[in-house]
A protein has these predicted regions:
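Short, Asp-centered acidic motifs that coordinate Mg2+ and/or phosphate
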Residues: 67-69
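Short aromatic/hydrophobic contact patches that present stacked aromatics
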Residues: 13, 43, 110
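Flexible, active-site-proximal loop/turn residues at the rims of small-molecule/cofactor binding pockets
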Residues: 18, 75, 140
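Conserved ATP-dependent adenylate/AMP-binding module captured primarily in the ANL superfamily
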Residues: 52-56
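N-terminal helix-turn-helix/winged-helix DNA-binding helices
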Residues: 1-29, 37-38, 48-49, 60-63
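Bacterial carbohydrate/catabolite-sensing allosteric modules
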Residues: 33-40, 60-65, 80-182
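Histidine-centered beta-alpha loop that forms part of the nucleotide-sugar donor binding/catalytic region
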Residues: 47, 74, 100-103
Length: 182
């Protein structure tokens, strides 16, 4: 049993929430390229934003199939603030690295973009160019990254004494809702 537990598979499990999002496709491509260069194989799974599927995939692959996980948290897990499945896997000795959509409550390594500063700096750049009516369109308002981006945008307006115009701010939880509002 101990021999199996310490066995290295040279395989990484990657769980992404949505393959149709070009960001996740690019991230996966980068992970696969570096893993291949380092002699690792990659198993990619898609949670389809489902907490149940995310949990099942973690449990299925953590039985010795992989050495660790790279994960972007599903929409459902973020909405429900349910991250116990990650902690259980980590407590069993399988390491997890979260990227993009993370859970602060989970003790693991994380790779993130500073969404707040990125939105603040982008909005400030437009203001510096002389733009006055800067719109915000977000179809991920229910996710941590969407909330942080909106906060950065609003902070840039505040810093520059630009009044918030709610007529040009469209924040929804899905692209379909956003398209309907536009």
């Amino acid at each position: 049993g101990l021999n199996l537990k310490n066995r290295k598979t040279k395989t990484i499990g990657v769980i992404i929430p949505n393959i149709l999002n070009s960001f996740f496709a690019k991230v996966f491509s980068g992970i696969e390229k570096i893993a291949d260069e380092k002699g690792y194989n990659v198993i990619m799974c898609i949670s389809n934003e489902s907490l149940e599927k995310e949990t099942h995939t973690l449990e299925m692959l953590s039985n010795g199939t992989i050495d660790g996980f790279i994960v972007s948290v599903s929409e459902e897990a973020q909405k429900n603030h349910d991250y116990t499945h990650f902690s259980a896997i980590i407590n069993d000795g399988t390491p997890i690295v979260m990227f993009d959509r993370i859970a602060d409550e989970v003790e693991c390594d994380k790779v993130i973009v500073d969404d707040y500063d990125s939105a603040l700096n982008s909005t400030q750049h437009l203001i510096n160019l002389g733009c006055k009516n800067i719109a915000l369109f977000s179809s991920i308002d229910n996710l941590s990254v969407g909330k942080l981006r909106a906060q950065g945008y609003l902070q840039a307006l505040k810093i520059n004494d630009i009044p918030v115009n709610n007529d040009i701010i469209l924040r929804t939880d899905s692209e379909d809702d956003l398209n309907d509002k536009i």
